[in-house]
């Protein structure tokens, strides 16, 4: 990237989250992540610009020194901090403004710090030689927390039975965040059972909310509409996917080709999510099983009588297993973490300079990582134990809010890293992104939010089996084919 020749016309709006705007290069497989600031701070003092630079350096350090060792080198791309001309940033801000969702416009692009994070464009396959005319398809999934908490500190029985995502759906519906309940359950996706994973992905396609996006050649082709009242257009998605599954254009086992295409598409995603497992002597992938946590959420629409405990698990080197292992660093739940947070706060009131030694605001380096890895299992009453558990919780929260990118394209026979489906065959890559640190100061908010979510769920469900909520949408036929 030639920083002295930056031209806003070489870049296009790619998307944004709460903290940053992403723009992608028109010709190269690169994106720039540019931080956002509240509109009222857009005047930007010199101090604010320095804080922004420190923030973006923290993002890169946290990804490089904490999340990459935990999740695996092959899955995490930390990027590099780049200095950018201020005029380029100002012009870029004007260019993307008209494409930004209205609900995101409470913040503006930072145009004063002169820095950004350069990363590979994970919606593309840089090693794909484009011998095939079909551009890469990229599926972005935000899987959320894949286990039921098992902490003795929990005060409500429902938290042992119903996952956080499914409970949160009721709260978001009541607050107008979404117009319909999602039937997606993270525990189904993380189960390792191809049947349960199929159901989870099918439910994401039916109600993507902000947990599923699909790109084609780097262009967004499927996501939740800005108007949440609109249903996602599956027919349009099928038309985009049809060239990738040409053998499904006729009736297949009596089913319409559109349904068969979606079935094949889901199976490709499942195969990528389960790939990468190590093999033991028998040649079977080593599996990861949850020993302490209940493996099934009672709010999941998947029939409980079809679950065979002990027969499934995630290959230990698969992307979902890696994410789940990091999520499970939270073994106390927020109800166990909050008292430890208060212990740290009380200590800091007496010794405010200790905030630096405890690395509450970073730096996110090997020392921080050592604290996360070496925390004691038993509480000895010390502030060291408390901050160790708080840091573990923050890292686990990052993993609970990360995204998985699966990018695939039709491959040539001699290409490696391919999904071995009977037909067609795809070359693919799997990556993890959205790996920012979760703020220490956010713990009181998480504690209050947890209580609101649980209490609202208990009031709204009033004890009938949660699966009865979905009776009106259970007429679909599920297809399970060998992969």
UniProtKB/Swiss-Prot annotation:
Coiled-coil zones: none
Basic and acidic residues: bias regions: 281-297
Main localization of the protein described in the UniProt heading: cytoplasm
GO molecular function, one term: inositol-1,3,4,5,6-pentakisphosphate 2-kinase activity
Keywords from the UniProt entry: ATP-binding, Cytoplasm, Developmental protein, Kinase, Nucleotide-binding, Nucleus, Transferase
Function: Phosphorylates Ins(1,3,4,5,6)P5 at position 2 to form Ins(1,2,3,4,5,6)P6 (InsP6 or phytate). InsP6 is involved in many processes such as mRNA export, non-homologous end-joining, endocytosis and ion channel regulation. InsP6 also acts as a key regulator of left-right asymmetry in embryo, probably by regulating asymmetric Ca(2+) during left-right specification.
Name under which the protein is recorded: Inositol-pentakisphosphate 2-kinase
Record organism: Danio rerio
Gene symbol of the encoding locus: ippk
